[in-house]
Amino acid sequence: MSDPLIVSYNDSAIYQSDINILKSNQWLNDSIISFYLEWLKDGGEDNKNKIPNQVLLLSPSVVFCCSFVESEQEIQLMFEQPLSLKTKEVIFFPLTNNRDPNVIGGGTHWSLLIFIKSLNKFIYYDSINSFNSSDAIFIISKFKFLLSSPPPKTNLKEFLINQKTPQQQNGYDCGLYVLSIIEELLKLIIKENENNKGEENKISYKDLLLSEFTNELLFKEITPNYIKDKRVEILNTILKLKK
């Protein structure tokens, strides 16, 4: 059965099967997650909201690939130069609970891990009560070279902060929650960058991302109706690009 290409955008590709997912109440796959992250990197529709250079959005495929790389040294060799990981102040990791290298795009749940360099810790958002927390620890074990004093594996939980997260009301919107949290946090980062007249070094990412204001904002903005609209918004964005 054919699955025609609808849109090719930067390093992402959207097929008809992805459109079908967005049109129905289905779990978002890695293709849709990757597309929207690329869209956010480019600053959205008007290309004005570009993220600071100190912030990195990793694609699901990179995170998935690193899950099966044996050593941190190999990950550094593969990704340090092209992505400049150690120069970034904030790194977003979209996670699934797929541990099977033979199943591309598999898993049953998305969650979000964020490394904050100035904090020297990772923060974690999960729309189903830390369902993927063991996967977060697993990914930290692969990227603990980012920490200023890399700990032994037994102490990794000390470097993870579970954040209160808006909770999904069904079994399929987790990916939309991840994208929505990323987008709302990026809006705050971009605004803070503008307030500092583009001087990125003046931004306190630790204070910004861990503030009570930020957490309250996420709960205020990311409601079930917001999530429902976000699914439609992503679909419409793709269809506009198709034209």
Swiss-Prot record:
It comes from the Eukaryota. Its EC number is 3.4.22.-. GO terms for molecular function: deNEDDylase activity; deSUMOylase activity. InterPro entries: Nep1/2-like, Papain-like_cys_pep_sf, Peptidase_C48_C. GO terms for cellular component: nucleus. The active site is at H109, D126, C174 (nucleophile). Keywords: Hydrolase, Protease, Thiol protease, Ubl conjugation pathway. Transmembrane segments: none annotated. Protease that catalyzes two essential functions in the nedd8 pathway: processing of full-length nedd8 to its mature form and deconjugation of nedd8 from targeted proteins. This is Probable sentrin-specific protease 8. The gene is senp8.
